[in-house]
Amino acid sequence: MNMLTALLVNITLSMLLIIIAFWLPQLNLYTEKANPYECGFDPMGSARLPFSMKFFLVAITFLLFDLEIALLLPLPWAIQMYYINIMMSTAFILVSVLALGLAYEWLQKGLEWTE
């Protein structure tokens, strides 16, 4: 199987799945589906209250800096490679960029809870 055949099969299957995904959903809109659900009980208050943007920003910041672990996980296996200088410089650049991002976030008071 050559590359063109594999590409055509993948594109065809992807398009078929996208078309099926748009055709299958039922368009029955029930009001119960839009209501909030709290462990089987009626909500005590309004579930549509706005939340603090600080929580959202801290969550996004956590996700961005949590990628550091995912990117540095292969580091012990990469040490066994022949190109250790390239691997160490790449890891150093990655950690430096993340440290600069943390310093910028700190200086912009993105980690402060009080306003």
UniProtKB/Swiss-Prot annotation:
GO cellular component assignments: mitochondrial inner membrane; NADH dehydrogenase complex
Catalysed transformations (reactions): a ubiquinone + NADH + 5 H(+)(in) = a ubiquinol + NAD(+) + 4 H(+)(out)
Membrane topology: Multi-pass membrane protein
Gene Ontology biological-process annotations: mitochondrial electron transport, NADH to ubiquinone
Source organism, top-level taxon: Eukaryota
Subcellular location: Mitochondrion inner membrane
Family: Belongs to the complex I subunit 3 family.
Protein's recorded name: NADH-ubiquinone oxidoreductase chain 3
Annotated organism of origin: Peromyscus polionotus
Gene behind the chain: MT-ND3
